[in-house]
Design a protein with these regions (language model features):
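Gly/Ser/Thr-rich beta-alpha loop segments that engage phosphate groups in nucleotides
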Residues: 9-14, 43-45, 131
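Extreme N-terminal starter segment of soluble prokaryotic enzymes
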Residues: 1-4
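Hydrophobic packing residues within well-ordered alpha-helices of enzyme cores
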Residues: 19, 52, 134-135
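Predominantly flavin-linked oxidoreductase catalytic cores and closely associated redox partners
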Residues: 8, 98-173
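Glycine-rich FAD pyrophosphate-binding loop
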Residues: 6-8, 14-39
């Protein structure tokens, strides 16, 4: 079967890794290769990711950057508390996606029209996240806005764990 996977984030990368040995699979990513980034959710459950990656013969531990010990919560009412963590890690998301996509042709910097894909492929899988490039929008969908920071530093790590500060009225974090 000839399959197009559109959106090469974690979901698209994972599908490429699972399908590439049994099908002709081609990936499409709207970002140019040199700008390819995968936003949001760099923290994940190590145990679940190990199991998923094992199905693609990938060692997830090779991509772990940090094992979380505590999650520091800073509420808007100046209440602060910590949650002990077990298995929450940050990982090299782009490195993992590239490993999953090894050996697959990917067209970067393009968003093909659905009609073009339908002419060439037996199946089209939309992995474009909440953009839903080819799927209808979900009525009454719920989005929780977040800010995520990558911290650049010299010398000692300025913060060694997860930090969450909810927005006022708990409308995001």
């Amino acid at each position: 079967m000839k399959i197009a996977v559109v959106g090469i984030g974690v979901a698209g990368g994972y599908l490429l890794s699972r399908l590439k040995n049994e099908h002709e699979v081609i990936g499409y990513e709207r970002m140019k290769e040199e700008n390819h980034d995968s936003i949001c959710a760099w923290g994940t459950s190590a145990n679940e990711m190990r199991e998923l990656c094992k199905k693609s013969e990938i060692n997830f531990d090779d991509f772990i950057i940090h094992h979380g010990k505590d999650m520091h919560i800073d509420m808007n009412n100046n209440e602060r508390f910590d949650i002990k963590l077990k298995g929450l890690v940050t990982f090299d998301k782009i490195g993992l996606i590239k490993k999953m996509a090894e050996g697959v042709k990917i067209h970067y910097g393009v968003t093909p029209k659905l009609e073009e894909l339908e002419k060439e492929f037996d199946m089209i899988i939309d992995c474009t996240g909440f953009y839903r490039s080819y799927l209808p929008k979900i009525e009454k969908d719920f989005f929780l806005p977040t800010y995520q920071y990558k911290i650049q530093y010299d010398g000692k790590i300025p913060i060694d764990d997860f930090f969450v500060k909810p927005f006022s009225k708990m409308t995001g974090y």
